[in-house]
Amino acid sequence: MSFSRRPKVTKSDIVDQISLNIRNNNLKLEKKYIRLVIDAFFEELKGNLCSNNVIEFRSFGTFEVRKRKGRLNARNPQTGEYVKVLDHHVAYFRPGKDLKERVWGIKG
């Protein structure tokens, strides 16, 4: 697989894949409920990050908020103008061991 033109997976694609997985296990759950669960999951993730909590999913990875230092000499790439960037917080994801190993094995 070439990394220059990768397929994009949307939330709707994930809902479809989960729905198929559930049906393959002889269970029934409508897609609208799967979408509600996914939306609630992301709201919880965002809420916890905004509360500065660390969110850990064993073997998958860890989400956290980190402080990024500001810079005096940042440049706006569109205008070329130099601007001051203040200290700010960013969401950060650190992959877990399982995920790292699986991604490491991707061919292409």
Curated annotation (Swiss-Prot):
GO terms for cellular component: cytosol. It holds the Pfam family Bac_DNA_binding. PANTHER family: DNA-BINDING PROTEIN HU, DNA-BINDING PROTEIN HU-BETA. The gene is hbb. Gene3D superfamilies: IHF-like DNA-binding proteins. Belongs to the bacterial histone-like protein family. This is DNA-binding protein HBbu. GO terms for molecular function: DNA binding; structural constituent of chromatin. It comes from the Bacteria.
